[in-house]
A protein has these predicted regions:
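Bacterial N-terminal signal peptides
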Residues: 2-14
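Sequence-structural signature of mature extracellular/luminal beta-sheet repeat domains
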Residues: 17-320
Length: 320
């Protein structure tokens, strides 16, 4: 593909033969250290999934959820399309509209799942069955619908619990949307209940705070929550980016090895400095839910509605 000189374009556009218009948008020179100016946005799988979510790099493959269809898929290098990995993924028995959402891998290489249908955090056992890890909160009542999660270096699991995936036939038992910690001994503690619609979650590089993607329709944003209890702080406000051409809100997020924040937002993936400066975007052409790094740490996988995308990055993802 031949690109026009940089002074003619601030947006480098890659046209797919079919599907959404995709591009890399550079807003700050600092983006050059993170993403090549000619980085390609590849559609590596375009399947029958309705809302792809929660990708994780697991045993040499990327796995991700199709939330409404209660299925998790896997994609391995060389596959023409992702194949079914878990069905059901969000319940012990098959049921519609209650699939898994966020996926993660613990320090022992085991797959963890936020399960909407079962309203819990679980682990995939070696026998292919789900092992419940957290089914009730610190007050002894059921969670709303655990949404996304991350794993600390000490093995603790942090997760968000809005009501997005709460089965319609069931009622919330908590009057708030919590962010929780699940310790290795099984104890659940509330980190904060002060955020409405907490969604994506990641630990800071020093493990002292959480970054949270807040899916508030009127005020989508990225916030931090100090784990010492010193409070919350907004890092980036995304409402001004919303438009007909830029669908989606703040949903999933990850940090790279330098502490930059890669969060889904209006238009696709927003790339922010640790201080919250918007450096650029990966524009996916449609609403985009989540992302993760895989392979050697320089490959970013993005779940974008009915598509799984891939972009090579200069910087590695945190943890690689």
């Amino acid at each position: 593909m031949k690109f026009l000189p940089a002074f003619f374009l601030s947006v480098l556009t890659a046209f797919a033969a079919e599907g959404p218009k995709q591009s890399i948008e550079k807003l700050d020179p600092a983006l050059d250290a993170l993403l090549a100016s000619d980085a390609q946005i590849e559609t590596i799988s375009n399947g029958s999934y309705t809302w792809s979510e929660g990708p994780a790099w697991y045993k040499g493959r990327v796995v991700f959820s199709d939330v409404p269809n209660n299925v998790a898929y896997q994609w391995i290098e060389g596959d023409a399309v992702a194949s079914v990995f878990l069905k059901p993924s969000g319940t012990d028995e098959a049921s519609p509209n209650q699939g898994s959402n966020g996926l993660a891998v613990d320090g022992e290489g085991r797959l963890l799942l936020c399960q909407h249908g079962s309203r819990r955090v679980a682990r995939l056992g070696g026998d292919g069955k789900f092992v419940p890890l957290a089914t009730k909160n610190h007050e002894g009542v059921r969670f709303n619908s655990p949404n996304d999660l991350c794993v600390a270096k000490d093995g603790a699991i942090y997760f968000t619990d809005p009501t997005y995936g709460l089965p319609k036939s069931e009622k919330s038992e908590t009057p708030y949307h919590g962010v929780y910690k699940l310790a290795t001994d099984g104890k659940v503690t509330l980190v904060t209940k002060e955020i409405q619609w907490p969604n994506g979650i990641a630990l800071s590089l020093d493990q002292k705070s959480l970054y949270l993607a807040v899916s508030d329709g009127k005020n989508p944003r990225v916030a931090t929550c100090a784990l010492d209890g010193s409070g919350l702080r907004d890092v980036f406000l995304a409402a001004a980016l919303k438009s007909k051409e830029r669908a989606g809100g703040c949903d999933g997020l990850r940090l790279d090895a330098k502490g930059n924040i890669w969060t889904t937002g209006p238009g696709g993936v927003l790339i922010l400095s640790p201080e919250g400066k918007h450096l650029g975007s990966i524009l996916c052409g449609q609403a985009t839910a989540n992302l993760t790094w895989g392979d050697d740490g320089h490959t970013l996988y993005i779940t974008s509605k009915d598509r799984l995308l891939r972009v090579k990055t200069k910087v590695k993802g945190a943890g690689f």
